[in-house]
């Protein structure tokens, strides 16, 4: 059974016209979870990764085990006000407004090679902000890995200049 077969698709969620890709069925399946993590770790294995970064909340689900598989640490990227201590912040545009993400100021040392992991690549706005945050903190983005990519939304276009992989593609 493929990884795609282990992802539940729920139509009209969270609102009419949206085809929601539900990873809970994938991560509940031991083989599916292991295969996902193994494939992402394989993508990064020869990239001399120093640390894995993942945005909340579902980036944590895949980011932590990928970091474990690579033998490196994990750094969370959170919404403003969720991390204690000094942070570095980046703002980015949403369809209707702005949002922001933060990382601890001392989490990434200059020159660190960073793997970015998330569950889904859609429009690319959030993950482009994560990459900018990593670079603002002094890190070098060594690659980006996603469990799912919604190819019609052309998120890769916002990630030009980075090496990107996804495990499962959907038109939308």
From Swiss-Prot:
Catalytic activity as recorded in UniProt: AMP + diphosphate = 5-phospho-alpha-D-ribose 1-diphosphate + adenine
GO cellular component: cytoplasm
Biological role: Catalyzes a salvage reaction resulting in the formation of AMP, that is energically less costly than de novo synthesis.
Class of the enzyme per the UniProt entry, highest EC level: transferase
Gene Ontology terms: biological process: adenine salvage; AMP salvage; purine ribonucleoside salvage
Pathway: Purine metabolism; AMP biosynthesis via salvage pathway; AMP from adenine: step 1/1
Name assigned to this protein: Adenine phosphoribosyltransferase
InterPro entries: Ade_phspho_trans, Adenine_PRTase, PRibTrfase_dom, PRTase-like
Keywords: Cytoplasm, Glycosyltransferase, Purine salvage, Transferase
């Amino acid at each position: 059974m493929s990884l795609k077969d282990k992802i539940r698709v729920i139509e009209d969620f969270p609102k009419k016209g949206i085809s929601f890709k539900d990873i809970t069925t994938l991560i509940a399946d031991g083989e599916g979870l292991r295969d996902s993590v193994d494939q992402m770790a394989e993508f990064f294995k020869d990239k001399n990764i120093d640390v894995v970064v993942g945005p909340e909340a579902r980036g944590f689900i895949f980011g932590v085990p990928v970091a474990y598989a690579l033998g490196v640490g994990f750094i969370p990227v959170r919404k403003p006000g969720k991390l204690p201590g000094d942070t570095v912040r980046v703002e980015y545009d949403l369809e209707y407004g702005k949002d922001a993400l933060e990382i601890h100021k001392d989490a990434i040392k200059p020159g660190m090679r960073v793997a970015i992991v998330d569950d889904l690549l859609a429009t690319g706005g959030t993950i482009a902000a994560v990459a900018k945050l990593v670079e603002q903190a002094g890190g070098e983005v060594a690659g980006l890995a996603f469990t799912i990519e919604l190819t019609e939304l052309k998120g890769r276009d916002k990630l030009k200049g980075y090496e990107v992989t996804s495990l499962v593609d959907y038109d939308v």
